[in-house]
Amino acid sequence: MSNQDIEEIPIRDSMIRLGQLLKLASLVEDGVEAAELIRNGLVKVNGGIEDRRGRQLHNGDTVTVNGQTVKVVAPEA
């Protein structure tokens, strides 16, 4: 996968929770769908399967769902 395939998702704060990012990036319709995908092991954070919907994501973290990868871009401190 090349960097062109990774969509950057800007966030307002220095951190966002996984479930929130999935909705913000339009990878899921709602929190129920996010929870289901995470529970079924279909969400990867930085290349590893993540099972916590509340996982904190920071600048540079990547999330992959259904072959689509997004990258968290936080504002500079």
Predicted regions and their residues:
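C-terminal structural segments of small proteins and small subunits
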Residues: R52-A77
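A basic, amphipathic helix-loop patch mediating RNA/tRNA/ribosome contacts
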Residues: I16-N59
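Generic structural motif recognizing short loop/turn segments at the entrances and edges of beta-strands
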Residues: D5-E7, G41, Q68-T69
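A detector for short, charged/polar N-terminal pre-domain segments
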Residues: S2-S14
